[in-house]
Amino acid sequence: IYSAAAYNPTYPNYKNPETGIWDEDKTAIEVYNPLGMLEITNKKIASHVNVNGRVNVEIIKGLNLTGFGSYTYYSLNDRRYIPNDIQQGSMNGNGQAYLKYAERNDLMGNLQLNYAREFGRHSINALALLEAQTQSLFESSTKTSGYETNYFTYNNLKAGANISWGDATSNATRFALLSYMARFNYMYDSRYVVTANVRRDGSSKLGYGNKWGFFPSASVAWIASNEAFMKSLTFIDNLKVRAGYGVTGNQDAIDPYQSLSLMAPNGTTLVDGSATTTFYIDSNPNPDLRWEKKYTFDVGVDLAMFQSRLRLTMDYYASTTKDMLYTYTVPVPPFVYTSMLANLGEMTLSLIHI
């Protein structure tokens, strides 16, 4: 659109009959012949599939076993050809073809055992959960240039005379997460509520010896509006006082294999007269990568009055995040590169929310 709006309108709207190439305004910066740009072939094909299923079995009264599984697939085909008879094509080595393929597979499954019963004024709900998930990613791309004809476009890469180091690449990554969780909830007479949770997660992204994290939490609540002495206050529909404390973990900022020392090819050299690929250290490894943990305390009041026409919620919230994941600047030497992802720093936050 920019080239169409900014291109010199006095230039001819056909190819130069002597050269067979679209005329370009050589004085313009990043403004190309818009008619020539129409000859660029650019095609993207994306596929997305999501399948999930759930099975529930009642073992005995109040005790249920539930299994859930999901699979998500995503792929992208990116195909592009810049012909040799436009300025962009001549700038990219007399025509350029590019192919890229990316594929992602996500698999998740869990088993959940839930028990819920009421005994007079007592109500209990207990849950045990086992969950596993994996994600794999594959990418490849190839780029060639030097095309004497535009007939093949991107359908015949070997028709391009030139391919430079790094123009053909591929990579694959995979990570897994395994979780165990248990929760117990107890309510007495619809007035007093106690909830306790324990969770243990293991991530393949983290350093050896630091892959597992333990994350407990607990909360209590008093539903004061259900007390006998509150019944005379008919304009109050709900009055609940609650407090909770818990620990959560984060490892999303970490890429697969970031705790390891990775090698990557960086060229070729002659060994005994034969071309041999050379490798180098690709990044700073950090075998001490571990879970970032957030410790949270919350106390609050929920109030609803006049048939819930008026609602009020007030909270005091405080949290401390420890072992924060951040990319820090490091000295060279002893490190190979100037930056590294590490667990450092602490952040505290407190607020009152109404």
Which residues make up each language-model segment?
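Extracellular/periplasmic, surface-exposed regions of secreted and cell-surface proteins
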Residues: 22-82, 92-352
